[in-house]
Design a protein with these regions (language model features):
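Helix-to-loop junction immediately C-terminal to a conserved catalytic motif
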Residues: 29
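Conserved ABC ATPase "signature" region
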Residues: 95-116
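Conserved ABC ATPase signature
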Residues: 120-124, 128
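Catalytic Walker B motif of ABC-type/P-loop ATPase nucleotide-binding domains
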Residues: 145-148
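H-loop/switch region of ABC-family ATPase nucleotide-binding domains
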Residues: 180-181
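Conserved beta-strand-loop-alpha-helix hinge in the C-terminal portion
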Residues: 200-224
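ABC ATPase nucleotide-binding domains
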Residues: 217-252
Length: 252
């Protein structure tokens, strides 16, 4: 498996079930260990990192099931649990030069959890749980964020909110690798998309080009409009192309 992702890039991986996408991500996240070969992060073999070095300030992992990260009775307590409680003291879990309250408030604002802090995590909607799980991961300030099916079980409203959050993270230099069957989400928010097949990424391109030139892995918008607007891969692309065509017709 060979994969090159630029710093601050949102890279999506699509592919059929059973091709090895989630397995590859679990290896990168050190949830599993390879039978053969080695994995290097920033030139260092992944097995030589301590858990603190790997997961605190370097690698963030978002599982398919966000509930697997919830361990407290309120959203607020769950957030502070990540950074070793509310006490302002240095620890391996929180070596950051920022007051914990300020860090939590910043992440709450980014992930739009205001108004949910006193609720039980299991009482939240699917989209709210996804944002809470992301907030817990982001409190550890990862440079690289791994996401497995981030839009699973959430509606279009929360997909848009999640996409906007990922773009903000990308703008701040966080590198994002996500595995997804949601081709519409990938087309809308990923900078590049790669196709995973038989244990490898066999092709990767800028997302709009990837989906516009693909007959199998493409969006519903592209399938319906490709005879008229072959480069349109999202609903927004189609609407923009139609408006442009109408303007050209009027000007003629």
């Amino acid at each position: 498996l060979s994969l090159d992702i630029k710093k601050g890039e949102i890279f999506a991986v699509v592919g059929g079930n059973g091709t090895g996408k989630s397995t590859a991500m679990s290896l990168i996240a050190r949830i599993r260990f390879p039978y053969r070969g080695k994995i290097y992060l920033e030139g260092k073999e992944i097995g030589k990192y301590s858990d603190d070095d790997l997961y605190h300030g370097f690698l963030g992992v978002m599982p398919q099931n966000p509930q697997s990260l919830f361990v407290k009775k309120t959203v607020r307590e769950d957030l502070y649990e990540v950074i070793d409680g509310k006490r302002e003291r240095k620890s391996e879990a929180y070596p950051i030069e920022m007051k914990k309250k300020d860090a939590v408030e910043g992440i709450v604002s980014l992930t739009r959890l205001e108004g949910l802090l006193d609720r039980h995590p299991y009482d939240l909607s699917g989209g709210e749980q996804q944002r809470l799980a992301l907030a817990k991961v982001l409190l550890l300030r990862p440079k690289i964020l791994l996401m497995d099916e981030p839009t699973k079980g959430i509606d279009n409203h929360y997909k848009k909110e999640l996409g906007e959050i990922l773009r903000k993270l990308s703008e701040h230099g966080v590198t994002i690798l996500m595995i997804s069957h949601d081709v519409e989400f990938c087309a809308q928010y990923a900078d590049r998309t790669g196709l995973f097949f038989q244990g490898n990424v066999v092709t990767s391109e800028e997302s709009k080009k990837f989906f516009a030139g693909n007959n199998f892995y493409t969006t519903a918008a592209n399938r319906m409009a490709r005879n008229y607007f072959p480069n349109a891969v999202t609903v927004e692309d189609v609407v923009k192309a139609i408006n442009q065509t109408e303007e050209e017709a009027v000007s003629c």
